[in-house]
């Protein structure tokens, strides 16, 4: 999960979360498909491919980006310099991304210090990249503080914070909905039932312990002492560094001797004076997590499922789900084995086996193949619904991913141009219960087997398409839906109905915001207004928090807005894998206690010349 690097600190390039062994250069497989995938009209597709892979010429990215985005793909007539430019740091998916950008006439630059790019995709987050980022003019991959979701401790703390907030709200008079001002009749994602073998039960609140294994932090004394006290040899626990990937630094705890050794090691580290003087030189923080000893097996082998959470836009939030693939071990599962390759499914671990060269195609299954196997092997024997993978499993993964995002939403840094693709790993136990293992920044985008060649390029291309289209619509002040570039991704959360400003946001663009979903009562009907036309500008009082860009238009109907409800394109003829998950997450319409609605005051018009000087001068 995640990366071991701290932002702004000298470090080696991070590795994708798995599947990098043996890769010394850019992955060329699958890259040829990029140019054949049509993008939506007007999304930077009119340029012929550039011949050069690098250039030393410079050009104003704001003018170029506005000319391309707002001029339906045509370069700005005010700029005669080469460009626009893109930068890729690292090899993970570089060939696919580069081919995509070149097909739009963009030119690749190799100097990471240059600031005249329109797209920057890096494996390693850099403080300088965020410091020089020009909001509304550039696209930058990875949210600055995505570690809230993509490190072990970050995700654990985020989920605990959500659980605490929901517990506190539920104790208020009238329950959670009364405290949070909810419409008790509105359908919610977590009000609807979900299917498990043999029974159907309502799931009113998604509780952390139902999808996330019991976990303790070893960097906190009271938590590690609690773990050392409760451990017994009937259990297996797995110890993980908080920010490593590829299975590095992971080991199992199965007996008192191993736990005693870990206890002594943590005490030595705590007593080390260097650790107290310089926390950066201390050992990396770790967690211990209850190991799921009864995983569902495919022909006797352990597997997990990689899915994707896409944050295509942060102003407003546009959050999507996409299927990925199943990852299997080469060896048969033995809970007592000390060989980690039988416990960890990622490709980096499987490549260590001498059998990998011969059997690598059988270590990655498509979701369609997994669905066929479940139908054939377990459908009738375990009383599962038909196509369990594309119905129950899909909906459950969407529920969990939406819950995790909502838990972090108010704390994530959001600027127009930030986007992120996060790999989410799920394990299914032999009772068909779905567990979230971890969420990964910089998910592996290599295509070293046939299934990955079919899955990865499509995921990357649609990620970039959706990031560009949502950026364009937010910049123009247009409504987000429908999205012409949405194909396989399923919409989990449409933030157009969110109450602004958000906590944790740092957006400086000042554009018109829609009224909040819950409006104050008035004696007369609201004044009608064309959906894409700004209202009359009047003086605005000083905001209580930084103003956030959002789209113009009338107040969204809470019964029809897609706030948290997965929406797939072409719902009239939907593949089972695009089955939307039910309802809107109950917490999704929450707002932090100190986040205030605009209270009826008019908001700024869509254009803000003072904050976009390059656009003003055109």
From Swiss-Prot:
Residue(s) at site: Essential for specifying elongation versus initiation step of the polyglycylase activity: 246
InterPro entries assigned to the protein according to its UniProt record, in alphabetical order: TTL/TTLL_fam, TTLL10
Broad EC category: ligase
Biased composition (Low complexity): 57-74
Binding locations of Mg(2+) 1: 425, 438
Binding site for a protein: 246
Domain TTL: 82-479
Biological-process GO terms, alphabetical: protein polyglycylation
EC numbers for this chain: 6.3.2.-
Essential cofactor(s): Mg(2+)
Alphabetical UniProt keywords: ATP-binding, Cell projection, Cilium, Cytoplasm, Cytoskeleton, Ligase, Magnesium, Metal-binding, Microtubule, Nucleotide-binding
Binding residues for Mg(2+) 2: 438, 440
Chain positions recorded as ATP binding sites: 240, 246-247, 289-292, 302-304, 345-346
Pro residues: compositionally biased ranges: 539-557
Gene Ontology terms, MF aspect: ATP binding; metal ion binding; protein-glycine ligase activity; protein-glycine ligase activity, elongating
Biased composition (Basic and acidic residues): 585-594
Record's GO cellular component terms: axoneme; cilium; microtubule; microtubule cytoskeleton
Chain spans, region Disordered: 1-76, 503-618
Protein's cellular compartments: Cytoplasm, Cytoskeleton; Cell projection, Cilium; Cytoplasm, Cytoskeleton, Cilium axoneme
Function: Polyglycylase which modifies both tubulin and non-tubulin proteins, generating polyglycine side chains of variable lengths on the gamma-carboxyl groups of specific glutamate residues of target proteins. Involved in the elongation step rather than the initiation step of the polyglycylation reaction. Polyglycylates alpha-tubulin and beta-tubulin. Polyglycylates non-tubulin proteins such as nucleosome assembly protein NAP1.
The record's note on its domains: Gln-246 is the main determinant for regioselectivity, which segregates between initiases and elongases in all tubulin--tyrosine ligase family. A glutamine residue at this position is found in elongases TTLL6, TTLL9, TTLL11, TTLL13, TTLL10 and favors glutamate-chain elongation, whereas an arginine residue is found in initiases TTLL2, TTLL4, TTLL5, TTLL3, TTLL8 and favors initiation.
Protein name: Protein polyglycylase TTLL10
Lineage: Eukaryota, Metazoa, Chordata, Craniata, Vertebrata
